[in-house]
Each structure stands twice: as C-alpha cells, then as structure tokens.
Amino acid sequence: MSTPFKMERGVKYRDAAKTSIIPVKNIDPNQDLLKKPEWMKIKLPASSAKIESIKNGMRRHGLHSVCEEASCPNLHECFNHGTATFMILGAICTRRCPFCDVAHGKPLPPDPEEPQKLAETIQDMKLKYVVITSVDRDDLPDRGAGHFSECVKAVRELNPNIKIEILVPDFRGRITQALEKLKDNPPDVFNHNLENVPRLYKEIRPGADYEWSLKLLREFKEIFPNIPTKSGLMVGLGETNEEILQVMQDLRDNGVTMLTLGQYLQPSRHHLPVARYVPPTEFDEFRDKANEMGFEHAACGPFVRSSYHADLQASGGLVK
C-alpha cells in the first residue's frame, strides 16, 4: 500500500508535482501540442534593464508579482513599461487549478509587515495605478480579505493620489465576511475572474463555483454601486463562443461593467493543453458584442490579461 502524499509547509509544488494531486486526471504530458500561430509570437524588448530593476525592487522588499509567479506572457512588456501586478499573501496557493502556473502547497502565515512593504515599494516606483492580487488562501478564516484591506489602507496612506485595483479570489464560503472586511478600505476597481464557462469548471477550476463567483461580484456591486466591477475570461480551453457570450451576459446581469478576454496559453506540458487558438478577428467580434451588451470597457485580444494595461483599461482606452 502506497504512503499518502504529504506536503511540507512553505514548499512550492509546481508542474508534475502539482498536477499529480489534482483530483481530475485529464492531462497527458506526452500529447502533441498545437503549433502557435504567428499572431501569438512575442517580440522581446532589446533592453532588460527596466525589467531587472523591477525584479530587484520586488526581491529587496520580499514581495511577489503575479507576472513572474504565473509566467505571464506579457511580463517583458509590462515590466519594461514600468508596471507590475503585486501578489500578496505569499506565492503558494491552496488551490491547484491545472491552467495556472502559480505554485500549490501549504502556505506560510501572512507577513504582517507586507502592507507597509508594499506601500513603500509602490512609493519608490512612483506608480499612479496599481493592481494588487493574491493566491487563494482557503487556510485563513477570512480567506485573506482582511490582509487585502490592510494593504489597500497602507498603500493609500503613503500614496494618496494612487488608483488601486484589487484582483481577488472567490473567498470560498466567506463572501459576507470578506466584503465586510473590505468596507473600510474599498478599492477604485474590484476585479474577480470567472476564468471560463461553467460547463468546464470541474476540469479547469477544481474547488471553485461559478455561482459563488457571480455572487461575489454582485454583492460587492450592491454595497459599492459607484465602484467599477471587472472580470476576465480565458478562451481556447474547449468552450464554445456561445458559452462565452452567455458568461458575458451573466456578468452584465450581475452588474459587471469591465471585461477582459484573452487567449489561454499552456504554461508547461503538465498543464491543460490549448484546445484552439482564437484568431484576433474573433476577439474583435467579442469586443463588439460586449459593447452591445453594455460593458463600459472591454479589453479583448490574444495577449489580454486581467491586469494587462489595467490603468489604460480603467481610463477607457483601447486594449487588445
């Protein structure tokens, strides 16, 4: 009889070590992969000085960026532009979604000094708009909502003119408590991603629930009717265009005013494969449909991610 796998606290489990403990076994690391089309090829910047400067600033304060931890394809562009999405509550997620490259495991307790470190780093970088996200922390009673609130408070105290967007997890089973924690320090934009269509949730987002996520977005909007709510979807995981359009309508029906839609990219052979590459023309069609549905802003394109040019998204600029 085999010995049950036991995770060590503070250890990052990635790739095969992570996906081997996902309940739904649907990944064959030896399968043939789709060839990337021309429109999915990235041009790297000639200089990496700005990129290294941001990375070093993060390391110096013991902070993390989702750009690095999730292997975002836009890292070079965003870092070279002088922007980054900060990831609080550590770099180990309690979930093990097979599309995501963030490490899974038993995370360490939250760093009580992180809000101040974050505020000082943002001040040093002279940012005017910042996105703060986190790993899932199902191990915490409030799922990390209180820490989000403390981070927003600290950042605003040192950077009074900054605009803050938070990209939050679903606060599983603690939505009411989480929103109560956020009341004293609300963001300028509230973002929570649905990721994909409900039919594929068991395969793509084990541990999550489509209706929970809609409830979170809806109830935040009921409490803060004047704060924009935002959500994002990945395409190319086996969903149909009709299903995506229905999710977009569900978002509008629950008060969401900002949408991001981008192509899913497989971080490694141990993650879910790309089912298809969606051409740019289809993203344009999704954006047109989003505008017809009444979204105030829709960023739709192959490389669009939730926080990709988030400052431009918030100001109503075209992002694709």
UniProtKB/Swiss-Prot annotation:
Residues engaged in binding [4Fe-4S] cluster 2: C93, C97, C100
Entry EC number(s): 2.8.1.8
Pfam families named among the record's database cross-references: Radical_SAM
Pathway: Protein modification; protein lipoylation via endogenous pathway; protein N(6)-(lipoyl)lysine from octanoyl-[acyl-carrier-protein]: step 2/2
Domain of life of the native organism: Bacteria
Compartments, as annotated in UniProt: Cytoplasm
Cofactor binding annotation: Binds 2 [4Fe-4S] clusters per subunit. One cluster is coordinated with 3 cysteines and an exchangeable S-adenosyl-L-methionine.
Family: Belongs to the radical SAM superfamily. Lipoyl synthase family.
Name under which the protein is recorded: Lipoyl synthase
Originating organism: Haemophilus influenzae (strain ATCC 51907 / DSM 11121 / KW20 / Rd)
